[in-house]
């Protein structure tokens, strides 16, 4: 855990925006902005981050000296993400510019849903703050499943927000959906 913690803290200190309380994908995005003039925070990237922190917490012993640090970051990131959820329950490819990417993006929605439900199931988030957002997100995910079982609205592999359509899918999106299902 010591090595993981050392590397995570370096990454957190470097890529976490203390104002927006979100993670940049990498340092090439520090000075980039979206069409609306806001910073670029990739939905799936922040989904990976909060899901990863949930997995760190799953691995840490209850009495770990590291637990409070990761619980604090988890709660802060969850609260930021909840505020950015759209009215239907989805998150978008660009967290701060959903108008440029109006379609729901299911890989980030699934990763965030997994983390929110993990937080609820483990007492890290309250019912009042996270239950409704988690259920709304789960419903969006279920509605994104085609009749043939394909999960739609998954942004293809990439490194930044891109437009997504109902017919786009990828295995990592399905994996994120299944991960969320493990906490339901």
Describe each model-derived feature in a short phrase.
Residues 23-31, 94, 156-160:
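Conserved catalytic-core motifs characterized by acidic clusters
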Residues 1-6, 57-75, 82, 119-136, ...:
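Structural helix-adjacent loops and short alpha-helical linkers that scaffold large soluble proteins
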Residues 2-5, 9, 47, 51-54, ...:
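A structural signal for well-ordered alpha-helical segments within the folded catalytic domains
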Residues 1, 39-42, 46, 63, ...:
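Solvent-exposed, acidic/flexible segments
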Residues 2-25, 71-89, 132-150:
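Long, well-ordered core segments of solenoidal/helical folds
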Residues 91-92, 98-184:
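CBM-like carbohydrate-recognition segments
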Residues 1-54:
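Loop-centered beta-sheet repeat module
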Residues 60-63, 67-89, 98-110:
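Long, repeat-rich segments with strong aromatic
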């Amino acid at each position: 855990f010591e090595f993981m913690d050392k590397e995570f803290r370096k990454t957190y200190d470097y890529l976490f925006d203390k104002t927006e309380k979100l993670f940049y994908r990498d340092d090439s995005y520090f000075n980039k902005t979206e069409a609306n003039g806001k910073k670029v925070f990739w939905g799936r990237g922040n989904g990976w981050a909060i899901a990863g922190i949930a997995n760190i917490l799953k691995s840490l012993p209850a009495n770990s000296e590291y637990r409070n640090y990761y619980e604090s970051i988890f709660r802060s990131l969850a609260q930021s993400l909840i505020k950015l959820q759209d009215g239907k329950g989805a998150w978008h490819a660009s967290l701060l510019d959903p108008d440029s990417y109006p379609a729901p993006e299911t890989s980030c929605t699934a990763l965030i849903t997994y983390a929110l439900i993990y937080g609820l199931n483990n007492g890290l988030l309250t019912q009042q703050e996270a239950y409704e957002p988690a259920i709304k997100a789960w419903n969006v995910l279920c509605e994104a499943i085609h009749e043939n079982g394909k999960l739609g609205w998954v942004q293809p592999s990439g490194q930044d927000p891109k437009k997504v359509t109902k017919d786009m899918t990828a295995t990592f999106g399905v994996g994120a959906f299944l991960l969320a299902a493990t906490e339901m």
